[in-house]
Amino acid sequence: NSWLRARWFANDAADRITRVMEGAAATDPMIAQVKMSEAMADLMIGMTFCESPLVASGPTATDTQNLEQAVANFGEAIAAAKAANNSEFELASVAGLAQAHLLLGNYAAAAAEAAKVPAGFSYDAVFNEEDRNWVVLVTTKGFNEAAGLMYKWWPKIDRTTTQSSYMRDPLTDEPDPRMPVYFDGEVATDNETPHYSQYKYALENADIPMLHSDGMRLIEAEAKYRTGDYAGMTTILNTLRAAVGLTAFATPTDDATAQSYLLNERFAEHFMEGRRRNDLHRFGLMKSVFAALNGGAGDSERPASGRPTKFSMSDSEPTYNPNINNDLTQRCLPKT
């Protein structure tokens, strides 16, 4: 898949830069960039897949092993960025390290790294007219409109004919500026399903944040939650809410409510950034969330039981990798 290729290219680029620049490579920002990119590929692989090789043509490794490799590689990237005096790649690597620790369950370490990332920082996936944003092209009003927001969220979206609106906050019913949406009654490309469009990214060259400071504050909040410090969690989350004009919520007194508040805020802050599925996997909520569809009746097209919570590796990897047995029965596939 593309992340395996990205990892290989980053590793190969580091070798070539070192070979050509020799001693000067150690303080060149390009080394920091490619080392960060290699670690970022490890992070995305570990977040998305239940297994993947750690190196090109290597044997299968677990998602945990890929995330542990991300931790090590982000450490190297941070050192390289410091040597190059490049704050952008250093902060992106620190943020990536915080995310990797979070996914590994190292909550104190995750919070410690996240705290180093200042407000306003964002490291984005960059798109342009040649490399277009397919989230926009497939899901967005005015483009293909082949996909849209699930019907679970429709009651929280107001119809409009003149401008985009915001999905309403589940706690206060206030429009949440972190979740721009668009629905004017138009149906999608199947000529049947109402097209509820995301509108956070409205242009085909819109960039998507991969790591950002608000996400780091969410990591700090989750670390508080994991230790039962609901008041500390609430303070962080309400600060994020205040920044967009939303009413604060009271400190929860039980775990279920605290978890719900945390995940609501993660959904809003990371809206359309590709984090929700992994959150449901991490918290063991995939089954209950899908069972609750249609007022608790479930959805035959989106079953709650036997539903994969992570992807197995791409079909092409075991086909062409001599160190992986090309046998579907040996692939991991965690399910509800």
What are these regions (language model features)?
Residues 1-48, 76-84, 204-211, 239:
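Conserved, well-structured interaction surfaces
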Residues 41, 48, 98-100, 223:
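Residue-level signature for tetratricopeptide repeat
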Residues 67, 105, 109-214, 259, ...:
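Hydrophobic-face positions in mid-chain alpha helices that act as interaction patches
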